[in-house]
């Protein structure tokens, strides 16, 4: 029964590759995919991990990491039809839970946000797609059918059938699960963005005030410079005016 179930799960993992990768032309090529190697080794390690067998699950995990560049903790729970495309750099933490028919691209991290024990990694529900280099952190939930854009940093729950992009990730679209059509959602409150915009406006205001002060200071200095430059001429003229009577008296013999 265990072997039969394992073969069914393996079949679904292979089906997921054919479903999601147009480059998968035949079974021989698919069997060379590092993502498939990683999930096969993980399922073996996880089965041993659940039986509380020490050391061996972790050893298998490290061998898988060495061979594929994909690091999956033996404790992570992963459903059927799981596909890691390309795979290099994928990290999945111990308490992560992944549903059925989930697809990850290279560089995805399902990580924690601290050193606390217990549930600390994401829960990814069925039919989720997580793009290249996305980082999903903490004990949050990515709802069924959600899409996470490449490079996004997700630290909050993503509702089902929504698309989240950006740093930090924001909901930008919602897909109808029946028709498959997406529609953009109204802008959500963005306190971080509003704070940054407020700081930007404040910096501009301060720059304008500094420019005004510099301009006023320049005018003030220019006025003083002109005043002091003119002062020697004024003093010389005053001295000449004051000495004129004395010179006249001297010429008339008053000083002899």
List each language-model region with its residue ranges.
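Terminal amphipathic alpha-helical/low-complexity segments used for targeting or macromolecular assembly
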Residues: 1-63, 179-256
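Solvent-exposed, flexible loop/coil residues
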Residues: 34-35, 40-43, 76, 82, ...
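Structural signal for interior beta-strand "rungs" in well-ordered beta-sheet cores
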Residues: 65-172
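A structural signal for small-residue-enriched, beta-sheet-centric alpha/beta enzyme cores
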Residues: 170, 174-181
């Amino acid at each position: 029964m265990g072997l039969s179930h394992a073969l069914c799960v393996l079949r679904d993992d292979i089906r997921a590759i054919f479903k999601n990768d147009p480059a998968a032309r035949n079974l021989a090529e698919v069997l060379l995919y590092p993502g498939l190697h990683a999930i096969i080794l993980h399922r073996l390690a996880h089965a041993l991990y659940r039986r509380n067998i020490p050391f061996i699950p972790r050893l298998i995990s490290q061998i898988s990491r060495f061979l594929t560049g994909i690091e999956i903790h033996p404790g992570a729970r992963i459903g059927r039809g799981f596909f890691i495309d390309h795979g290099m750099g994928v990290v999945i933490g111990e308490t992560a839970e992944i549903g059925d028919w989930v697809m990850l691209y290279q560089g995805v991290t399902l990580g924690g946000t601290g050193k606390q024990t217990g549930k600390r990694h994401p829960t990814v529900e069925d039919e989720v797609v997580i793009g290249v280099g996305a980082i999903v952190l903490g004990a949050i939930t990515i709802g069924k059918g959600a899409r996470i854009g490449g490079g996004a940093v997700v630290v909050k729950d993503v509702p089902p059938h929504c698309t989240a992009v950006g740093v930090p990730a924001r909901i930008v679209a919602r897909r109808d699960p029946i028709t498959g059509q997406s529609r953009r959602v109204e802008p959500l409150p963005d306190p971080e963005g509003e704070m940054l915009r407020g700081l930007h406006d404040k910096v501009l205001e301060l720059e304008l005030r500094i420019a005004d002060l510099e301009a006023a200071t320049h005018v003030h200095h220019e006025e003083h410079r002109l005043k002091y430059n003119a002062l020697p001429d004024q003093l010389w003229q005053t001295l000449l005016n004051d000495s004129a009577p004395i010179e006249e008296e001297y010429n008339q013999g008053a000083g002899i």
